[in-house]
Amino acid sequence: MTQFDKQYNSIIKDIINNGISDEEFDVRTKWDSDGTPAHTLSVMSKQMRFDNSEVPILTTKKVAWKTAIKELLWIWQLKSNDVTELNKMGVHIWDQWKQEDGTIGHAYGFQLGKKNRSLNGEKVDQVDYLLHQLKNNPSSRRHITMLWNPDDLDAMALTPCVYETQWYVKQGKLHLEVRARSNDMALGNPFNVFQYNVLQRMIAQVTGYELGEYIFNIGDCHVYTRHIDNLKIQMEREQFEAPELWINPEVKDFYNFTVDDFKLINYKHGDKLLFEVAV
């Protein structure tokens, strides 16, 4: 049993047993297959904590880990909102939200690419500012990135689910706290928890720190009603030991990472489970 499997199953059980239904509301989300309202059971404010002795990835089902890393690189490294760039990587998870111009509007990578921080007399974006400050001002309590920009929310195809990171350097270790306003536990959470841990490992490597604690906070923690049956099946499955994530130690520049610089070794998992997408 992995740290992630244990915490994940605990949250799923809590939502199924104690979650509050939103069926009283005319909800925004619709099922992609038939356009009917996609309702949820939800609880508020859940936290997952990992000591980084193992990589947090589910073993009760197969997680498309390379796809998760490609999405991470698209947002954090390319700082892109262009869905066609993601399509070129063979990833189509954002196709349902693609606008006429081929982008997701002013969301995700667009926000990270804005040059809105002052550094040594010039403007830089949030990622470059974070990397510089972690190296040169590690004791700061202001190592934060933010994707929730009220000025741009109306210009986003989808407002960010994971919207904030806060980084701490203590005793030579890089700790990361992530905040998600909303998390679809069947589809979004396994991706997000894994990929932001990968981000922590990447940034620790290029800034010269050891790995510290990893904390993932969720505001609206929910399960879609059509996902419940398969989630119950998933929770009863055999759990395996956590795999090892290898990251190419030769990469010292954040912008030089490619998906080929990552290997998930001995990843044992249950069969893939299909969960319908709500948009």
From Swiss-Prot:
Keywords: Methyltransferase, Nucleotide biosynthesis, Transferase
Enzyme kind, highest EC tier: transferase
CDD domains according to UniProt: TS_Pyrimidine_HMase
Organism name: Bacillus phage phi3T
UniProt family annotation: Belongs to the thymidylate synthase family.
Binding of dUMP, residues: R141, R142, R181, S182, N183, D184, N192, H222, V223, Y224
Catalytic activity field: dUMP + (6R)-5,10-methylene-5,6,7,8-tetrahydrofolate = 7,8-dihydrofolate + dTMP
Top-level taxon: Viruses
The keyword Cell cycle is annotated on this UniProt entry: no
NCBIfam families in alphabetical order: PRK01827.1-1, thym_sym
Enzyme nomenclature, EC number: 2.1.1.45
Binding site for (6R)-5,10-methylene-5,6,7,8-tetrahydrofolate: D184, A278
InterPro entries reported in the protein's UniProt record: Thymidate_synth/dCMP_Mease, Thymidate_synth/dCMP_Mease_dom, Thymidate_synth/dCMP_Mease_sf, Thymidylate_synthase, Thymidylate_synthase_AS
Gene3D superfamilies: Thymidylate synthase/dCMP hydroxymethylase domain (3.30.572.10)
Subunit structure of this chain's protein: Homodimer.
Lineage: Viruses, Duplodnaviria, Heunggongvirae, Uroviricota, Caudoviricetes
A single GO molecular function term of this UniProt record: thymidylate synthase activity
Recorded metabolic or biological pathway in which this protein acts: Pyrimidine metabolism; dTTP biosynthesis
GO biological process: dTMP biosynthetic process; dTTP biosynthetic process; methylation
Protein name: Thymidylate synthase
Function summary: Provides the sole de novo source of dTMP for DNA biosynthesis.
Active site annotation, chain numbering: C161 (nucleophile)
